[in-house]
């Protein structure tokens, strides 16, 4: 059955989600928007939607090649992808390989310190509460996720981290940290949402130059879209 777009059901900071003629399938449309200060400042960038869509598709396929289930089905267009409709778990899972960002505000740790083993952090997805950090006990007690699924997700996260660190390292890049989300389809765990330079930090391995959304967040004197494109090309996701 050919998938056809129907109604817009959700619009976030970086994507719009549409229903389709198949109740088990959605369409994600990436946006040109980039935001900082919790969405208070938004700017549009040409080609950002295309880069993020292709980058996400490339990374998700790399991950799925290691027998990790993702929601990705197929590309629909330059800025749209067809995905499985998951029952999303309301938790953001963050993996940290180097000390940067909010970690520096919460702990007395030197910036750019290598973290071994990597730190896993959980954040409850709630804009009104500003996505508070939680632990496994909150997750279980508040019925956000089962203990069994937590164990599986932790194992998957470490596996994904090793996969991605290797991909970036071979491209002379450092994977500093990243955020992922998971959901359920017929009771099975799937990696959902996206992996892009909007929700990860990547530095050049030799110069430590920032090549992700921090360029925009910190108003650095760099072209953020050219950096996104360079990272994509360096890891093998060729962007025109």
Curated annotation (Swiss-Prot):
Belongs to the SAICAR synthetase family. It comes from the Bacteria. Keywords: ATP-binding, Ligase, Nucleotide-binding, Purine biosynthesis. It catalyses: 5-amino-1-(5-phospho-D-ribosyl)imidazole-4-carboxylate + L-aspartate + ATP = (2S)-2-[5-amino-1-(5-phospho-beta-D-ribosyl)imidazole-4-carboxamido]succinate + ADP + phosphate + 2 H(+). It is an enzyme of class 6 (ligase). The keyword ATP-binding applies. Pathway: Purine metabolism; IMP biosynthesis via de novo pathway; 5-amino-1-(5-phospho-D-ribosyl)imidazole-4-carboxamide from 5-amino-1-(5-phospho-D-ribosyl)imidazole-4-carboxylate: step 1/2. Its EC number is 6.3.2.6. Disulfide bonds: none annotated. InterPro entries: SAICAR_synt/ADE2_N (IPR028923), SAICAR_synt_PurC (IPR033934), SAICAR_synthetase (IPR050089), SAICAR_synthetase_CS (IPR018236). The keyword Ligase applies. GO terms for molecular function: ATP binding; phosphoribosylaminoimidazolesuccinocarboxamide synthase activity. One of its GO terms (biological process) is 'de novo' IMP biosynthetic process. Signal peptide: none annotated. HAMAP family: SAICAR_synth. CDD domains: SAICAR_synt_PurC. This is Phosphoribosylaminoimidazole-succinocarboxamide synthase. GO terms for cellular component: cytosol. PROSITE patterns: SAICAR_SYNTHETASE_1, SAICAR_SYNTHETASE_2. It holds the Pfam family SAICAR_synt.
């Amino acid at each position: 059955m050919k998938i056809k777009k129907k109604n817009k059901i959700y619009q976030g900071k970086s994507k719009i989600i549409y229903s389709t003629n198949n109740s088990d399938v959605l369409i994600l449309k990436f946006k040109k928007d980039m935001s900082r200060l919790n969405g208070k400042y938004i700017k549009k960038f040409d080609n950002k939607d295309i880069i993020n869509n292709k980058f996400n598709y490339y990374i998700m396929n790399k991950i799925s090649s290691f027998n990790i289930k993702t929601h990705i089905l197929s590309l629909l267009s330059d800025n749209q992808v067809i995905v499985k409709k998951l029952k999303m778990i309301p938790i953001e899972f963050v993996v940290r390989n180097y000390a940067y960002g909010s970690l520096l505000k919460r702990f007395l740790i030197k910036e750019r310190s290598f973290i071994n083993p990597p730190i896993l952090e959980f954040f409850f997805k709630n804009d009104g509460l500003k996505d508070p950090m939680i632990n496994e006990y909150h997750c279980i007690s508040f019925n956000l996720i089962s203990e069994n699924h937590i164990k599986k997700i932790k194992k998957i996260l470490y596996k994904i981290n090793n996969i991605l660190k290797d991909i970036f390292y071979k491209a002379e890049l450092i994977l500093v940290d990243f955020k992922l989300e998971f959901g359920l389809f017929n009771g099975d765990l799937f990696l959902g949402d996206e992996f892009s330079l909007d929700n990860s930090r990547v530095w050049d391995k030799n110069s430590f130059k920032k090549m992700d959304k921090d360029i925009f967040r910190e108003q650095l004197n760099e072209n953020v879209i050219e950096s996104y494109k360079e990272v994509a090309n360096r890891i093998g996701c060729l962007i025109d």
